[in-house]
Amino acid sequence: MTGRHILLVEDDRFLRRACETSLRQRGFSVAVAVDGEEALDKVRQARPDLILLDLLMPRMTGIEVLRALRAQEPTRGIPVLILSNSSRAQDAEEIRTLGVCDYLVKANLSLQELGDRVTRLLEG
């Protein structure tokens, strides 16, 4: 998995740092974005192998980011793992239709589990 490129989109700086550090220790290359607009800019600069995406962020929600990614052929197939505390049924239904690969609840987040799921998703 060494060198696989992950884009981490998370507005909470403490969680962002913890996830980034944990993933780097596993050998992943990690870019970070603090909101959806920055995430889309980073995707245009360098297509990641996987996106870890928060749903509730300033300026642009995770669902809006997903819609934008899925609307463009070059980004349509990028795997996305959601990190969120949102339990809204409407959000859950929409992210399923947008082809999200996995969903982790932040309140229950284990960095070990995050790393394991990222590894599994990237191994196919």
Where are the language model's segments positioned?
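Short hydrophobic/Thr-rich beta-strand motif most characteristic of the beta2 strand and flanking loop
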Residues: G27-V34, K42
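Receiver (REC) domain active-site loop signature in two-component systems and cognate sites
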Residues: M57
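Conserved acidic carboxylate
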Residues: E10
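Charged docking surfaces used in two-component/phosphorelay signaling
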Residues: R17-Q25
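Active-site residues of response regulator receiver
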Residues: D54, S84
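Active-site beta3 strand of CheY-like receiver
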Residues: A46-L52
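Acidic catalytic/metal-coordinating carboxylates
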Residues: D35-E38, T61-R67
